[in-house]
UniProtKB/Swiss-Prot annotation:
Coiled coil: none annotated. It catalyses: a 2-demethylmenaquinol + S-adenosyl-L-methionine = a menaquinol + S-adenosyl-L-homocysteine + H(+). It comes from Chlamydia caviae (strain ATCC VR-813 / DSM 19441 / 03DC25 / GPIC) (Chlamydophila caviae). Its EC number is 2.1.1.163. Methyltransferase required for the conversion of demethylmenaquinol (DMKH2) to menaquinol (MKH2). It is an enzyme of class 2 (transferase). This is Demethylmenaquinone methyltransferase. Pathway: Quinol/quinone metabolism; menaquinone biosynthesis; menaquinol from 1,4-dihydroxy-2-naphthoate: step 2/2. Pfam families: Ubie_methyltran. Belongs to the class I-like SAM-binding methyltransferase superfamily. MenG/UbiE family.
């Protein structure tokens, strides 16, 4: 039985995975997420405050304030356990925490210049509403950065190897490392089922964002988009 993609099921799953979430990201990215996080931070650029959506345990936000020491970050996630780990891990970091749904942010209209979603786009039940909400809270010409685990193009030589890794090795590692085998299966499937770039980029356009930067990593296994509000 697969997990559904409704909010309560996903929230329960991520709460249960919180203690092992960073290890899971290492498995899904073959350890390359550390490099991608650094690249993402640099591509986001300097801002007084980063609004880190789907923040997880705060690794991307911490990378950001490491790169830009005068900045602060607001971490938003619907998993209280994820935020609890971030609070415990970075007690002295200039972080503010909001437990909530990014499709209904308790944030004023046009109040932020920079937002980011890392490894969370594929888990959003309603990407259209989430993008519209982010557009609402960004100032004119504000930016949204997205870092996501994606797939090589269908005709790429690494496409088959990537599919086999997600289909067989990730669930196997999940069985060995965790009691929550179903969650590992879901996370692998979420990468496979993420729509292609053309579809996602039309969503961005429909939500009144334009692409200012885009970069692929590891033959397309990860993608960064920097979007500007229009």
């Amino acid at each position: 039985m697969q997990l559904s993609t409704n909010k309560p099921d996903l929230q329960e799953m991520f709460d249960s995975l919180a203690p092992k979430y960073d290890r899971i990201n290492s498995i899904l990215s073959l350890g390359m997420h550390h490099l991608w996080n650094r690249k993402f931070s640099k591509m986001l650029g300097k801002s007084e405050c980063l609004l880190d959506l789907c923040s997880g345990t705060g690794k991307v936000a911490y990378r950001y304030i490491h790169d830009y020491p005068k900045s602060q970050a607001i971490l938003v996630d619907f998993s209280s356990n994820m935020l609890a780990i971030a609070k415990q891990r970075y007690p002295k970091a200039p972080f503010t925490f909001i437990e909530g749904d990014i499709a209904q942010l308790p944030i004023d209209q046009e109040s932020h210049t920079l937002a980011a979603i890392s490894y969370g786009l594929r888990n959003l039940p309603d990407r259209k509403n989430a993008l519209n909400e982010i557009h609402r809270i960004l100032k004119p010409n504000g930016c949204l950065g997205i870092l996501e685990l994606t797939s090589p193009s269908d005709n790429h030589p690494m496409y088959l190897a990537h599919r086999l890794y997600l289909k067989f090795l990730v669930p196997l590692i999940g069985r060995l490392c965790s009691k929550n085998k179903q969650a590992y299966h879901y996370l692998a499937e979420s990468i496979k089922n993420l729509p292609k770039d053309d579809y996602l980029e039309q969503l961005f356009k429909d939500a009144q964002f334009q692409i200012s930067k885009k970069r692929k990593f590891a033959f397309g296994a990860a993608t960064i988009w920097i979007l500007q509000k229009i």
